[in-house]
From Swiss-Prot:
UniProt keyword annotation of Cytoplasm present: yes
The protein's name: Pyridoxine 5'-phosphate synthase
PANTHER family listed in its UniProt record: PYRIDOXINE 5'-PHOSPHATE SYNTHASE
List of residues binding 3-amino-2-oxopropyl phosphate: N6, R17, G187, G208, H209
Cross-referenced Pfam families: PdxJ
Lineage of the species this protein comes from: Bacteria, Pseudomonadati, Pseudomonadota, Alphaproteobacteria, Rickettsiales
Residue positions binding 1-deoxy-D-xylulose 5-phosphate: D8, H9, R44, H49, T99
KW Mitochondrion (keyword) present: no
EC number of this enzyme: 2.6.99.2
NCBIfam families in the cross-refs: pdxJ (TIGR00559), PRK05265.1-3 (NF003625), PRK05265.1-5 (NF003627)
Chief location category: cytoplasm
Catalyzed reactions per annotation: 3-amino-2-oxopropyl phosphate + 1-deoxy-D-xylulose 5-phosphate = pyridoxine 5'-phosphate + phosphate + 2 H2O + H(+)
Gene: pdxJ
Purpose of the protein: Catalyzes the complicated ring closure reaction between the two acyclic compounds 1-deoxy-D-xylulose-5-phosphate (DXP) and 3-amino-2-oxopropyl phosphate (1-amino-acetone-3-phosphate or AAP) to form pyridoxine 5'-phosphate (PNP) and inorganic phosphate.
Species annotation: Anaplasma phagocytophilum (strain HZ)
Length: 233
């Protein structure tokens, strides 16, 4: 199983004081040195953490794939086409939310998203949709011809309820049967990672806030190495 490390909240710490530290590139490279297979960043419309220049610095100075999370807007499409990250993950976005609250509703803005997906793929970028573990949304994603699905596993990470893990397991099977690659993300800590890593057909997880918090006491390298050891054991 692969590990994507989201470095958004490294930028959050930096932006709180308007400084140049901590360096998002330095922390990303530490994560890579200790087992991260790719680096994830979410460029929000309000630029509350990662900024445009961070994307280009990461693309230039980090030697693993960049996974750009973004809303399905013309502005973000233009940025993605110029940056040319290896992967783009389309996510829902609300200005008032603290973090992404749910997966995409695939029925909303269907034509707009379909256009953006086709444009990204035309530029050689693999496209992921961030979805709740819903059979209806997975079927819609298949019709949209995306490459991957990232399952929103936040409900399980909060509740640790067996039925939530069963929903994730079933959704991962549906993604696989539809011919798409399945990832998972949102709210994952060490304990959740151990359970999710055992789910068949999930090939990667994205972890951000938890690892940045762990890095404060344990160091980014140690936190990433522990997470990678858990999901590959």
């Amino acid at each position: 199983m692969q590990l994507g490390v989201n470095v958004d909240h490294v930028a959050t710490l930096r932006n709180l004081r308007g400084t140049t530290y901590p360096s998002i590139v330095e922390l990303a490279n530490i994560a890579v040195e200790h087992g991260a297979d790719f680096i994830t960043v979410h460029l929000r419309e309000d630029r509350r953490h990662v900024r445009d220049d961070d994307l280009y610095a990461l693309k230039k100075h980090v030697n693993v794939p960049i996974n750009l999370e973004m809303a399905a807007t013309e502005e973000m499409l233009a940025i993605a086409k110029e940056l040319s990250p290896e992967f783009v993950c389309l996510v829902p976005e609300k200005r008032e939310e603290v973090t992404t609250e749910s997966g995409l509703d695939t029925k909303l803005l269907y034509d707009t998203r379909l256009f953006i997906i086709s444009e990204l793929q035309r530029h050689g970028i693999k496209v992921t949709l961030f979805l709740d573990p819903s059979e209806e949304d997975i079927a819609c994603a298949k019709r949209m011809n995306v490459d991957k699905i990232e399952l929103h596993v936040g409900a399980y990470c909060i509740s640790r309820a067996p039925q939530e893990l069963e929903m994730i397991t079933r959704a991962a099977q549906l993604v696989h049967e539809a011919g798409m690659i399945c990832h998972a993300g949102h709210g994952i800590d060490y304990e959740c990672a151990a359970a999710i890593s055992k789910v068949k057909h999930i090939t990667a997880i994205n972890v951000g806030h938890f690892l940045v918090c762990e890095a404060i006491t344990q160091g980014m390298g140690n936190a990433v190495r522990k997470m990678k050891d858990i999901i590959t054991s």
